[in-house]
Amino acid sequence: MLCIGIETSCDETGLALVRDGRLVHAVMSSQADIHALFGGVVPEIASREHYRLIGPLYDLLLREAGVGPTELDAVAVARGPGLLGSLLVGMAFAKGLALGFDIPLVGVNHLHAHLLAAGLERELVFPALGLLVSGGHTHIYRIESPVSFRLLGRTLDDAAGEAYDKVAKMLRLPYPGGRILDQQGRRGIADPRLFPRPYTDNDNLDFSFSGLKTAVQTHLSRHPELVPSPDAAQAVAGGHDAPEGLRNMCASFNEAVAETLCIKLGRALDGDDGVGVRALIVAGGVAANSYVREHTARLAVSRGLELIVPSPPLCTDNGSMIAYAGWLLRQGGLSHSLDLEAVPRGRAIPDDYRQGPAGCS
């Protein structure tokens, strides 16, 4: 079965082909340079860029893969959560393919696709505890199978990735700034007393990183010399060493985020939801962060769990994960009608699949 996947939930336009669970080819266009001019994603610009790019990328994908459009057996598309205008562009294109070639349409939960992405590189193990950590979401799931996810904890305000971007903005670093903060932190020494582990003094599995962001802001107001000049910030973004104090602050911030994530994961593993768990899956853009990878690896080893983390290219938004998730859903005979609706961030995605014969096209 050959499934095409379409990802347009935010500012990356990604398309990919997965045949029988293996990646055939993928193409991607990022809008990061455009939105960097505004310090963050501008929804109207994002949707217009998706509209401009999606057709040419589709043609490029098929041409480079040596695949004809009539060979497609299914079309999978990110239905949410995400920016509504961006999602609608991908949804409209996917529906056109489904209608034009009379193939099944599969709406994919963008967050679930992130957690399944590593299946393109290795065998997934279930039941698993899943941590989805990205710019818009920081969620913990218990995952029984590729089609069975139960949300245990979620972002209440600022997600981890959003905190990275806002701290980078405070330091005059370009969007997206997470990679730069990770890089500079590696050259510094963390002070565990500098920043709090936010929203951990409770017994739940939810996250709130607004307090950490405020703590960084307060620290910078007391130490304005840590904020680089525009020219110095540009040099830091280019890979030059920041001053020692700033490198140490970056290290402390990275440690605070990673430890907070692991505190909540450990709590989940200690509770009823951790019974029988065999693996820890970590995914999303922030899963590429070296501190998050190291801390979750130590947690997995201490609990005797397999750690499953996709390679960095599969951590960011991409069409490959949508195509793979769509292929998995079709293996279970699941699809949607052409009435499928996009679901913006903040709304629950309904379980409204249609059941048909497994693996059919």
Swiss-Prot record:
Catalysed reaction equations from the record: L-threonylcarbamoyladenylate + adenosine(37) in tRNA = N(6)-L-threonylcarbamoyladenosine(37) in tRNA + AMP + H(+)
Cellular location(s): Cytoplasm
Cofactor binding remark: Binds 1 Fe(2+) ion per subunit.
Gene3D superfamilies, sorted: 3.30.420.40
One GO BP: tRNA threonylcarbamoyladenosine modification
Organism superkingdom: Bacteria
Protein name in UniProt: tRNA N6-adenosine threonylcarbamoyltransferase
Lineage: Bacteria, Pseudomonadati, Thermodesulfobacteriota, Desulfovibrionia, Desulfovibrionales
Gene: tsaD
